[in-house]
A protein has these predicted regions:
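Conserved recognition-core residues within compact binding domains
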Residues: 1-78, 82-101
Length: 101
């Protein structure tokens, strides 16, 4: 899907939610880009609807990785290469075995 010249992919496991390589999240249900909200650890979260009145918390960096970064070894964590938790660009993310501290 292309919106304003930016390519988006469906976030696996979420209907009607798409994410760009830059970390922008689009809700087809609401027809708008969602704003990420920082949690107490500094990660940006979105709150997609997964049912009639149910919301799910999802970190934006995980949505980017699920949609854009292959994970053939089924690694569980997504790491920010530059340690900036708000830089959710696909080029800044990597699947890892354990979260690097």
């Amino acid at each position: 899907m292309i919106i304003d010249g930016i390519e988006y992919k469906l976030i696996p496991g979420l209907m009607d939610y798409y994410v760009s390589k830059q970390g922008l999240v689009y809700s087809a249900r609401r027809d708008r880009i969602l704003k990420g909200h920082p949690d107490r650890k500094g990660y940006l979260n979105i709150y997609p609807m997964i049912g009639h009145n149910k919301k799910k918390t999802m970190r934006v960096h995980r949505a980017v990785a699920l949609a854009w970064i292959p994970n053939p070894d089924n690694k569980p964590e997504v790491h920010h290469k530059d340690e900036d938790k708000t830089n959710n660009s696909v080029d800044n993310l990597a699947w890892v075995l354990l979260k690097k501290m």
